Each structure stands twice: as C-alpha cells, then as structure tokens.
Amino acid sequence: MDLKGKRVSVIGAGKSGIAAAQLLARKGATVFVSELGTMGAEEMQHLREMQIPFEEAGHSPAVYEADFCVISPGIPPHAEVVTTLQARNIPLYSEIELASRFCKARIVGITGTDGKTTTSTLVHALCEEDGLRNGYRAYSVGNIGVPFSSMVLDMKAGDIAVVELSSYQLERSPTLKPEVAVIMNITPDHLDRYAGELQGYAAAKFRIYANQGAGDTLIYNEDDALLREHFACRDQFPFNIMSFGMEPACKGVPDIRTFFLEGDTLVAHTPDGDEPVLVTSDFLKKSFRGRHNISNVLAAVAVAGALGIQREVVCQVIREFRGVEHRQEFVMTINGVDWVNDSKATNMNALRQALEALPATAVLIAGGRDKGNDYAAITRLVEKKVSLLIALGESQDKIVSAFKDVVAVKAAGSLEDAVLLARDAASSGQTVLFSPGCASFDMFKNFEDRGMQFKQCVHQLSSW
C-alpha cells in the first residue's frame, strides 16, 4: 500500500486512532486526526511529536479533504461524519484493515460474542512458546487492547499476529485475510448497532473469512446452533474448515478435523483417528473454571492444530494458564467466601456462563448500562444459583423488576455499597460474583476500570 502523497483523515483519537495516525505518517501519508470529544494530554503529545495536525470537540470540513479515512470502531454507522463521508464516496477503513495492509506476519484472527479475549490470550501463549522453540515471534493485538498498527512494522515474515476482532472492526476491513480464522460463538449483542437484527451482527462476524481461500483455515464452534447451520454445507466454502465443541455432530465423520470433549478428555479427531490431547483436570482450577473455558481451550487447541504446534507445547502452555483479568477472575477468599471479578461480562450470555460455572450458590452483583437484555432468559438459572441479587447502575430498576419474584433482590447506590451488601449477605462456602451482564459506561470508563474498582473494594474489605 503506497501512501506517499495520500491525504488521510483519522476519525477518533483513542488508542487505535493514534496508532493508525502514527503508522500513516511513518508511511508518508499526510494525516489529519479529528476527535468529536475531548482529547487527553498524552494523545495530543503523541501527535505533536510526529507533527500530525489534529482537532477536538468536533469534526471540521478538513475531515472531508481526504483520499480515504480510518475510523475508530466505536463510532456508529449512523453518525453524521460517517454518512457525510459515505455521501462523498470517501472510503472508510478500520485500523485493523490499515495495519493488515502492511502485515508480513501470519495472521490468526479470532472473533465471537464471548470467549475471544481468553482464547486470543491462550493462542498467543501457545504461539509464544512455540516461537521460542522455532525462531519466530508472536504478537497479541487488536480488540484485546494493543492496536495492530502500533506493532505491525515490527512483524517479520514467519511471525504470528494473533488478532482479536470485534464486529465493529470487521465491518470496515474489506481485504483482511487471516491464515486462520476462528468464530467462537454468535449470540445477541450490540444489536442497537444492527437495527435490532441478529443477522446483521452475524454478517459482520462472518466477514472474518470473506477473503480466505485455499490454504487458509476457518475454525468454528460446533455447539453454536447458528454457526453449525451456517457451515453445514462445507463444500461451498473455498477454505479448510475445522470445528470444536463439547459433543460436535461431526465426531466420527471421516475427512473432518475437529476437537471435542469426551468425558473429561479433550480429543483431536482427524482422518487418521482420534487422539487424546489432555484432560480437563490438567487446566481447570479456581482461577480458570467453567464449561465455557473448556470451549475456549478447545478452540485454542484447534488453532494449534491448524498451525502445526506440537502436542507437548499445547499441554505445557494450557496446564500453566491462569485465565485473563476481568474474566471470572478469582480475586481472593475472605472468611470462607470467594470473590470473583467478571467485569467483562457485558451481555446475558457471559452472565449465564459465569452462573453456570459456579460450584455453589452465590451473591450476584449485576447491572450497568442495559443493552436490550432479556433477563427472562436467565430467570431459572438465577433462581437456582443465586441467594441474593444486588442490582447496580442504570439497569437497576429493570433488574429488580425482572427478578424480585424469584430471588431476594437489593439495590445499591454505588459499587462500594454493593460490595458491602454482598459481604454482609455471603456465607462461608459461597461466592460473591461480580458479573454485570451490562455495559460499563453508566458509571465507569470501561469494563477494565469497573473491574479494577471492584477488586480495590474487595481488597479494602480484607484489610478491615
């Protein structure tokens, strides 16, 4: 991609926007950064250091003086700046798309509603260990928090870039071509962006394989009904297909590669027969538990199979894995009560998985900015698993109304109050589970900030 002499506007000055602007400037483009809100001092300093002009608190006409634009994923498709750019036929690309144009490394792309961060982290750990033995480097970038653009120029042929991909990022990545693509699952989420339609959300996820061909591999979750139906006619796709699942329908089918659970053993099924990989007791622990995490491990093992990573490496890395921060993260035990931070649970499916993973009953802290949640879908599970539900945030009234007839419910005015209520209610042997099931932006900067504040509150309890 030759950028010399090209004028490029970057819309949005978050981490990915700044990284994109820096990459564009290094490649010779004339760059302009435009931020609708207020920019931080650090972001402005980064741009000044590279003499990149910018604006904040609005988008001026200068934005439209561009050959193409790189747009931050959080900007909705109906935003005025987007519709104006489209009306002027100015191409819009994601930061992922931009970086991929310069990527010499092999790309492993991982998407899905839930599980993609844990799986991406695990796949990166597998590649990192394998790379130490075989002379390549592994990078973890994308939606996981490190912009692809900030690392891509360091990547060499033979390296592996593990790229976590959101639906927003995939929307505007028309030439992205992962060597290995993974779809973890597709359940209702972000439907406000897709006119309330699951099909639109799924279509964005399916863009991950749009450019794959012979020699590339698509890995999907056989347990997900939507994915199972979508990939039922494998012959219509030009790439290799592998699957994983607890009890996949293709188990025992010749010429199919799949990874499944048989009893407590993870098994690789190939045309040559079935081969046990490892048992769940090797990796399930207090800090990494639940059937959904078995699914995440199966996905990572499938990627290892596609990349040719040896079983010895797979077993070593998975046995040592301790989970990911804010994903059912064990914080500590206080007076016999386990405290678990699941701040990343921003939708109903993630909350359901957290409840299903509980070894005993729990005090549940939930709530935040509602995303059109259907709480009726988990009513029976809450009744079975929860002794007290503490409702928090903008969705507080909706949660109280949804569950007041099946479980004791209390409302909390702040996260600190919620933690104190949970402390007073929980008994030895129980868990206090912070799994909001909602977005964080009503009270916090993001889910990471929300999780950190929860952990701080818990640590303060232990010092009293």
Curated annotation (Swiss-Prot):
A GO CC term assigned to this protein in UniProt: cytoplasm
Keyword presence, Transmembrane: no
Pathway: Cell wall biogenesis; peptidoglycan biosynthesis
Catalytic activity: UDP-N-acetyl-alpha-D-muramoyl-L-alanine + D-glutamate + ATP = UDP-N-acetyl-alpha-D-muramoyl-L-alanyl-D-glutamate + ADP + phosphate + H(+)
Alphabetized UniProt keyword annotations: ATP-binding, Cell cycle, Cell division, Cell shape, Cell wall biogenesis/degradation, Cytoplasm, Ligase, Nucleotide-binding, Peptidoglycan synthesis
BP terms from Gene Ontology: cell division; cell wall organization; peptidoglycan biosynthetic process; regulation of cell shape
GO MF terms, alphabetically ordered: ATP binding; UDP-N-acetylmuramoylalanine-D-glutamate ligase activity
Role according to the record: Cell wall formation. Catalyzes the addition of glutamate to the nucleotide precursor UDP-N-acetylmuramoyl-L-alanine (UMA).
Protein name: UDP-N-acetylmuramoylalanine--D-glutamate ligase
Organism: Pelodictyon phaeoclathratiforme (strain DSM 5477 / BU-1)
Name of the gene: murD
